[in-house]
């Protein structure tokens, strides 16, 4: 079984933990709204006003004038992330970090020591809460794809288990947009086909999916059937240092893109300094989901 652990509003939650007077208030971590900054993280209070990550800070302030803006302390968040990762490694060496605030864990070999996967997931969630005073949402499922969806369903402070014999019952009522690789354009095609749920997608003939999406159609069919054979890949000796983010909405203005490029560059630079390294080559990778 696979666990996906995802820290809830990580940057903002760390700030609220360290400054109890911020509890219950709308918190935004990111750039100065007077200097073309961008929202790096928003707590759940401010999200109720429509604020989300990757949004220009000036726009966020218009949506929630009472929001409290805090500068990002990326080095410190990395230290807290290391503490979280140490908790993961108590239960399994098979930990695949995705970013500072989320990771996949393969706990298939941990049952004799720590009990069933659901128990391991709850122990991890409890340890993070008790030792670090932070909240994680946890999904437990037969594979990475399902575990990721499970951890997202009941945020914040969620815990969802998907049993192997209940995969289709879990997936079928969900909207097709829950599938990896279904972006705005793909969603429009499904709407024209009358497909709204994963169940409806699963019932489409594979030939129809391939005719509209090519080889991507077969990938979507497998996900709709709950199939994901990717293993959890633990940390290896790094040959490169990178940082990436996924935007909740498309970015199409140069100022926001420039601000985020600077943000990601600063995060990579901090990690280089932590490990006393320097880079020789710089690469920029852009991915679009259609």
Residue ranges and their predicted role:
Residues 1-100, 104, 111, 224:
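Residues that scaffold, gate, or flank divalent-cation-dependent active/transport sites
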Residues 14-16, 39-42, 146-154, 192, ...:
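Short acidic, glycine/serine/threonine-rich loops at helix termini
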Residues 115, 153-160, 195-198, 216-219:
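A short alpha->loop->secondary-structure connector
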Residues 98-102, 141-144, 236, 277-281:
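Short Gly/Ser/Thr- and Asp/Glu-enriched loop/turn motifs at secondary-structure junctions
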Residues 178, 186-286:
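DNA-contacting surface of Y-family translesion DNA polymerases
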Residues 116-177:
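Long, highly charged, low-complexity intrinsically disordered interaction regions
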């Amino acid at each position: 079984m696979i666990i996906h652990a995802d820290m809830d509003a990580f940057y903002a939650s760390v700030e609220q933990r360290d400054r109890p007077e911020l509890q219950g208030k709308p918190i935004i971590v990111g750039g100065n709204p007077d200097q073309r900054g961008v929202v790096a993280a928003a707590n759940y209070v401010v999200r109720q006003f429509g604020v989300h990550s990757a949004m220009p800070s000036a726009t966020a302030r218009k949506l929630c004038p009472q929001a409290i803006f805090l500068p990002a302390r990326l080095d410190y968040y990395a230290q807290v992330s290391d503490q979280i990762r140490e908790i993961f490694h108590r239960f399994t060496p098979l930990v695949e970090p995705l970013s500072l605030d989320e990771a996949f864990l393969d706990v298939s070999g941990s049952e004799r020591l720590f009990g069933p996967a659901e128990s391991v997931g709850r122990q991890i969630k409890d340890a993070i809460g008790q030792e670090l005073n932070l909240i994680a949402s946890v999904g437990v499922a037969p594979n990475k794809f399902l575990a990721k969806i499970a951890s997202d369903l009941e945020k914040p402070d969620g815990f969802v288990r998907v049993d192997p014999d209940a995969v289709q019952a879990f997936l079928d009522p969900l909207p097709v947009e829950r599938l990896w690789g279904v972006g705005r354009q793909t969603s429009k095609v499904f709407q024209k086909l009358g497909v709204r749920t994963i169940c409806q997608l699963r019932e489409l003939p594979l030939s129809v999916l391939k005719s509209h999406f090519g080889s991507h159609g077969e990938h979507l069919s497998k996900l709709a059937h709950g199939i994901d054979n990717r293993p959890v890949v633990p940390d290896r000796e790094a040959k490169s240092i990178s940082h990436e983010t996924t935007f909740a909405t498309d970015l199409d203005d140069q100022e926001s893109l420039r601000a985020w490029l600077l943000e990601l560059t600063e995060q990579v630079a901090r990690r280089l300094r932590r490990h006393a390294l320097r880079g020789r080559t710089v690469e920029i990778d852009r991915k679009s989901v259609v």
